[in-house]
Structures are given as C-alpha cells and as structure tokens.
UniProtKB/Swiss-Prot annotation:
Name this polypeptide is given: Colicin V production protein homolog
Main location: membrane
Native organism: Haemophilus influenzae (strain ATCC 51907 / DSM 11121 / KW20 / Rd)
Segments crossing the lipid bilayer: 2-22, 26-46, 62-82, 97-117
Primary gene name: cvpA
High-level lineage: Bacteria, Pseudomonadati, Pseudomonadota, Gammaproteobacteria, Pasteurellales
One Pfam match: Colicin_V
Keyword Transmembrane tagged: yes
Keyword Cell membrane: yes
Compartments, record wording: Cell membrane
Membrane topology of this protein: Multi-pass membrane protein
Amino acid sequence: MIDYIIIGIIAFSILVSLLRGFVREVLSLGSWIVAFIVASQFYPYLAAYLTQIESMYIRNGTAIAILFVLTLIVGAIVNYVISQLVDKTGLSGTDRVLGAAFGLVRGALIVAALLFFMDTFTNFEQTDWWKESQLIPHFGFIIEWFFQQLQASSSFLTPTLNQ
C-alpha cells in the first residue's frame, strides 16, 4: 500500500515538472529561496515604515509577508519572461525532459522527507505495510546520505550524530 503512495507522489512530481519544464521549475524554486532570503534580511527596513501598526510582532510579520509576496510576484514575472524565451528558442522538448528529471529528484526528496518525519515522530515504522514495503529501504539510504552530508558540512552537528 505505501509503495503505491510513494510511486504516486513521485509520478505526480514528474508529471508536474514535465508539464512546466526544467526552467520554470528551477526558477520557481529559486524564487521561493530568494523570497525567503529577502523577507528574512530586509523586513526591518520595511517595518520601520509601518508605524501605524502598534505591535512590533504584527508590524514585523506584516513586513515579512509583504516582502515575501512581492518577491514571489517579481519571481513569477521573471519566470514567465524566461520561459517564453525558452519556448521561442525551440528548446521546449529538452526543457520538458529535464523538467521530468527534476521532478523525479524532487519527488524522491519529498518522499524521503515524509518518510523521515513519519519514522521519527510516529509509530508507522511498526506497521505491517511499512515493514512489507519494497521501496522504503531505498529511501533510508537517501535519508542517511543527506544526514552524512549535513554532518560533514555543518558546524552545528557533531561527529557523534550517528553514534
């Protein structure tokens, strides 16, 4: 049962990315990352102009929301323009195939994250359908690799993470 859900999540991600194309997917992801950075770094500057809001928390939250949404809108416009250029150059077939590959990787990462949280915060790993899954062990490898990379590159994680 869980294997069908895993396949469904990955297939859906592939289909969405196939339809949207690699350029749109990457620019969309980049827009979200940039929006997060812009909102988290520049909200104090906008909050200083929102003096009509008395609560500092609401003022800061409003500034964050405004910056985040505006950055996403600018990202969507840039995404649209660049996507139109890709379509005009005749690279849409290649763009869609690369998009499907992007969707496969994204789907696998989404499934790995879901399985990690289910394993860590629930008792699903003790159920029969979890134990009988043919696919879950493969995602265990991805999760382990991810935490090894984090451990190797982060000063916050000590080498005793896996011990």
